[in-house]
Swiss-Prot record:
Locations listed in the record: Cytoplasm
Pfam families tied to this protein: Phe_tRNA-synt_N, tRNA-synt_2d
Protein family (similarity comment): Belongs to the class-II aminoacyl-tRNA synthetase family. Phe-tRNA synthetase alpha subunit type 1 subfamily.
Quaternary data: Tetramer of two alpha and two beta subunits.
Cofactor(s) required for function per UniProt: Mg(2+)
Protein name per the record: Phenylalanine--tRNA ligase alpha subunit
Reaction(s) catalysed (UniProt annotation): tRNA(Phe) + L-phenylalanine + ATP = L-phenylalanyl-tRNA(Phe) + AMP + diphosphate + H(+)
Gene Ontology biological-process annotations: phenylalanyl-tRNA aminoacylation
GO cellular component term of the entry, any: cytoplasm
Ligand binding (Mg(2+)): E265
GO-annotated molecular function: ATP binding; magnesium ion binding; phenylalanine-tRNA ligase activity; tRNA binding
Organism: Mycolicibacterium paratuberculosis (strain ATCC BAA-968 / K-10)
Length: 347
């Protein structure tokens, strides 16, 4: 304060309040108002110095002087608060104007994703069999050689066991591999579930094929397995016909041709006749099937003289390819939007 006495009269205090009000009213933005607050309400402002000077006022006058100083400071503070509210409202209004969205402008169309056609097919197959009373079963993609080959009646020297056909997992001798088919789920299911069993398994499989128009090293299979008392090839044929009609239309029908698979006896390949989505009708090889081999049942602890079963397996990529007239299987894995658009992806 120095040696200069502070005037605590009502006139002096009123002048300090008036100066603060005028200064706050001139503030054009919040930054300017903040600077003026320091000048008029800060620790070195006239009203702050007036409060500090109360200690030098005679005791009999100090109470009245204190009330005057506090009232003046409250008036200045009120003027500041009112101007602060005004400037904040102006700022918010300006932001709303600057950031407003013109709803009359044409919108930018955002592409909408969808499920991959293989996923759509897999879900449709699952729904078809669930509606028939079957259940879903799953198994690991990294499989034990025991389940992939041994328990499925593959001889030790079968060519499918070679590294030219199968991806083995390091270290050598681990007897772990990437499953070459979904058939290992058959054995796992028979070991884990009570009979009778009616299950399908849908999943990825792996083989050392080169990627070309009709092959891919990673592909999807659907595997069906039924084990019960008294099952025959007639039950298998009926199941295949129902499956074909669900996927290819009510006119579809199947036929079977003798073949060999280690895990079924008798074994057959399945052909399906249908009217294609791009026109034309005819027979196409679809997959493999047969009655579950007695050795597979024995490996799961099931008496083949009491129970019998049938199994079938189809590739989803192949099914989608010939059902929809897709010339090149690589289109399914390369993510080209031009290919995916007809199925709803990116539409």
């Amino acid at each position: 304060m120095g040696d200069q006495p502070v005037d605590l009269s009502e006139t002096a205090l009123a002048e300090a309040v008036g100066a603060a009000r005028q200064a706050f009213a001139r503030a054009g933005d919040l930054d300017a108002l903040a600077r003026l607050k320091t000048e008029h309400l800060g620790d070195r402002a006239p009203l702050a110095l007036a409060r500090q000077a109360l200690g030098g006022v005679p005791k009999d006058q100090r109470a009245d002087a204190g009330r005057r100083v506090n009232a003046a400071r409250a008036q200045a503070q009120q003027a500041y608060d009112e101007r602060l509210d005004v400037l904040r409202a102006e700022r918010d209004a300006a932001v709303l104007v600057a950031e407003r969205i013109d709803v009359t402008l044409p919108s930018t169309r955002q592409p909408v994703g969808a499920r991959h056609p293989i996923t759509i097919l897999a879900e449709h197959i699952a729904d078809t069999f669930i509606a028939m009373g079957w259940e879903l079963a799953e198994g690991p993609e990294v499989e034990a050689e025991q389940f992939n080959f041994d328990a499925l009646n593959f001889p030790a020297d079968h060519p499918a066991r070679s590294e030219q056909d199968t991806f083995y997992i390091a270290p050598e001798g681990s007897r772990q591999l990437l499953r070459t088919h979904t058939s290992p789920v058959q054995v796992r299911t028979l070991l884990a579930r009570e009979l009778p069993v009616y299950v399908i398994s849908i999943g990825r499989t792996f083989r050392t094929d080169e990627l070309d128009a009709t092959h891919t090293p990673v592909f999807h299979q659907v595997e069906g397995l039924a084990v019960d008392r008294g099952l025959s090839m007639a039950h298998l044929r009926g199941t295949l016909d129902a499956f074909a009609r669900a996927e290819f239309g009510p006119q579809a029908r199947t036929r079977i041709r003798p073949h060999f698979f280690p895990f079924t006896e008798p074994s057959a390949e399945v052909d399906v006749w249908f009217v294609g989505k791009k026109g034309g009708a005819g027979w196409v090889e679809w997959g493999g099937c047969g009655m579950v081999h007695p050795n597979v049942l024995r490996a799961a602890g099931i008496d083949p003289d009491v129970y019998s079963g049938f199994a079938f397996g189809m590739g989803l990529e192949r099914t989608l390819q010939f059902r929809n007239g897709i010339p090149d299987m690589r289109d399914m894995v390369e993510g080209d939007v031009r290919f995916l658009l007809p199925f709803g992806v990116g539409a």
